[in-house]
Amino acid sequence: MSYDQAVLNRIWSETILTELHRFGVKHVCIAPGSRSTPLTLEAAEQPNFSIHTHFDERGLGFMALGLAKASQEPVAVIVTSGTAVANLLPAVAEAKLTGEKLVLLTADRPVELVGCGANQAINQLGIFSQHVSANLNLPSPSLNTPLNWLLTSVDEVMFNQQLHGSAVHINCAFPEPLYSDGEKSAYQSYLSSVEAWRKGGQTYTQRFVSPSFRDIPFCADRKGVVVIGSLSAEHAQEAKAFAQQMGWPVLADPQSGVSSDWSHYDLWLQQPKLASQLDECDLVLQFGSRIISKRLNQWINKQVSQSQQGRDVQYWFISPSLSRDNQTHLPQLHWVASPKSWVERVDVKSSSTQGWADGLLTDIAHVRAHISDEFLFSSASTLNEIALAADIEERTQSVDVFLGNSLFVRLVDMFGRLNTEVFTNRGASGIDGLFATASGVQRSRGKPLLMYIGDTSALYDLNSLALFSRNDLPSVLVVTNNDGGAIFDMLPVPQEHRTAYYQMPHGYQFEHAAKQFGLKYEKPTTLQMYQAMVADHLSSGQGTMLVEVQTPPSQAAELIKAFNKSLHASL
């Protein structure tokens, strides 16, 4: 039987995309390409999808990551064959570690055109290796392959994603012709096998996993410390409320978007007088993963390791992810649950240890005041990276925050306080794709956005500024330009090679980059100028403004060293 291959390609694409929508996909990200035409045209015709486009597949993948991160829903990505597929790998690797659900719909040449010199054909099978939770390599659409097989195959992949998170890869081999005016209605007999599904609204197959949740052997009379890692603001607030109910210290990572009276722990844990008081704990209760602070990670390791030396210190970890999050391989009780569901199962009683570490609060308040005096309120206060970090709480009211990687996120951990939704890429902690991810976050959330990104990270993802050029929502992109990798001033790299092989100074500024993409540009010279222009744009501005804050290369490291010395002397 002869058939129109282009129409059959469209039927398969429609079937796949309809099923993905029933699995919760609302956003589809598309890069240009001919081989992906069946998927692109079908996505464009489905009214239930929000379509996002970008000319760069690497940026497209990260934009999808941001959409998935903010929406907590799966996001589809459509690209053509060849290196277009390979360019998705960085975003896929990040999603593997942080759990965002991406559905990669990659167009491919049919099998007879792979490995024989055909144009734009590479071996795409297994290209994402262990960075995806499931693979589906589809044959070329054919009337000999029933649509109910296609649906159960897609369902298998999506059920796997529901259980394990991260990206899944569906490789679609489309033969030519790719374009046709033919009608799908001519293939009614082929479509009839899934007619009931087409008229319904449910996925073709359904699976239900019975929850298994043992009783929690919780002892409210332990001296607990609650650590809050990378969580949504809602979940972080639930964890914080639990800690406050127990009367225990709360050490909140910047990624949680919450703060507490116990903030700036990366600084005061370096002070033996203060750290020794917290060492009396016998339960570390951690909600969420990906702790930024090296000192906090070291403190957890030190405390829990003592349980192997006769001291009973327990380490409990609460996360909905099945993934192992235990970088120093401590004895750990992992509750696979959201903070809310876990807290609801705990029988919280009055605790005899309420306020057991409150003696620390006076000293911590002194640390906070010392930060303000040094970097915000002193007549000598200047515009530097630490001042930006210390000021962040005042800039982030009623806006979403995206923190880039490398130096600045660590400065926020040391000197900042937050009380808003915070987004990061702290899985692989790469410096690529950060503008694109932030754009995806804002597209999903629809709120004003304040982003902080380093100069090297900005250069790495410069073409993703195009994603902000057609944006009407107020956005401020703060580029901290210390002329290269100032993070290496904080690390024991060889002095003789630090500049040439680690920091790699570039001498670039960002005014013309902003102009090329039609963005507003400002370069403040004082902290007061910075505060005013950011506040004004986020409250009453429109579109995107890039704010460049230029500082000397080694300034941040020198200021931290001087501050720690001053703090130690004042305690």
UniProtKB/Swiss-Prot annotation:
Binds 1 thiamine pyrophosphate per subunit. It comes from Vibrio parahaemolyticus serotype O3:K6 (strain RIMD 2210633). Keywords: Magnesium, Manganese, Menaquinone biosynthesis, Metal-binding, Thiamine pyrophosphate, Transferase. This is 2-succinyl-5-enolpyruvyl-6-hydroxy-3-cyclohexene-1-carboxylate synthase. Catalyzes the thiamine diphosphate-dependent decarboxylation of 2-oxoglutarate and the subsequent addition of the resulting succinic semialdehyde-thiamine pyrophosphate anion to isochorismate to yield 2-succinyl-5-enolpyruvyl-6-hydroxy-3-cyclohexene-1-carboxylate (SEPHCHC). SUPFAM superfamilies: DHS-like NAD/FAD-binding domain, Thiamin diphosphate-binding fold (THDP-binding). NCBIfam families: menD. GO terms for molecular function: 2-succinyl-5-enolpyruvyl-6-hydroxy-3-cyclohexene-1-carboxylic-acid synthase activity; magnesium ion binding; manganese ion binding; thiamine pyrophosphate binding. Pathway: Quinol/quinone metabolism; 1,4-dihydroxy-2-naphthoate biosynthesis; 1,4-dihydroxy-2-naphthoate from chorismate: step 2/7; Quinol/quinone metabolism; menaquinone biosynthesis. It catalyses: isochorismate + 2-oxoglutarate + H(+) = 5-enolpyruvoyl-6-hydroxy-2-succinyl-cyclohex-3-ene-1-carboxylate + CO2. It is an enzyme of class 2 (transferase). Its EC number is 2.2.1.9. Homodimer. Its cofactor is Mg(2+); Mn(2+); thiamine diphosphate. Pfam families: TPP_enzyme_C, TPP_enzyme_M_2, TPP_enzyme_N.
